[in-house]
Design a protein with these regions (language model features):
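Protein-protein interaction/assembly regions in multi-subunit complexes
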Residues: 1-190, 194
């Protein structure tokens, strides 16, 4: 088996590798290992703010939007989050600080990354009827390394109308693709066109 990086690559966060003098089963084994075993960060828990509140201008806003919280949480889980393989985080069940703690209470800087979002729909006097909330509106409370990358900031999450707001804390932990699709580190493998 011979491998070589295709000329002109890597580009940004992508790479193309040409594998030759091999058969499909060997390449498939590599593909399956990359899918199943490479550690990746993904959002696993989201705590939404609920209720009605009043903003600084006295306008009453409610924490509702067009998507149920469960659907929005699933979308958040699928957002690509940078993973630092140089200084990896522990899996929560292996973290020295959290492994003996009840699952709901697990989480520390050694095993999770914390994100937050606070967005509201257009104000009552605005001409706009709706505002789209994007992945780029999410900010990290942890290390800035884990900020959503520019190429993923335009992923739409939901739409807010006048009088609506969305506020949450999201918790990302390390996992592997064999456990859930949100931890897939590999986006695409393909054969060159012939």
């Amino acid at each position: 088996m011979k491998t070589e990086i295709v000329e002109g690559w890597p580009q940004g966060h992508e790479i193309r590798i040409l594998i030759s003098e091999t058969n499909a089963s060997q390449v498939n084994a590599i593909r399956r290992a990359l899918i199943a075993d490479v550690p990746k960060l993904a959002i696993t828990r989201v705590d939404f703010s609920q209720g009605v509140t009043q903003d600084n201008k006295g306008e009453v806003v409610e924490s509702v939007n067009v998507l149920p919280d469960e659907v929005l949480a699933h979308r958040l889980a699928m957002i690509p989050i940078p993973t630092n393989l140089e200084e990896p985080l522990y899996a929560p069940d292996q973290c020295p600080n959290c492994k003996d703690v009840v699952e709901r209470d697990r989480g520390c800087p050694m095993c999770q990354v914390l994100y937050t979002l606070s967005a509201r729909g257009p104000s009552a006097d605005s001409e706009e009827e709706y505002k789209t909330v994007y992945a780029g509106d999410i900010t990290t409370i942890s290390d800035p390394f884990y900020d959503i990358r520019d190429e993923h900031k335009s992923i739409p999450l939901t739409v807010l109308a006048k009088g609506q707001f969305l506020e949450f804390y999201a918790f990302a932990v390390v996992g592997r693709g064999r456990d859930h699709a949100k931890w897939l580190s590999l986006i695409h493998i393909s054969e060159p066109t012939r």
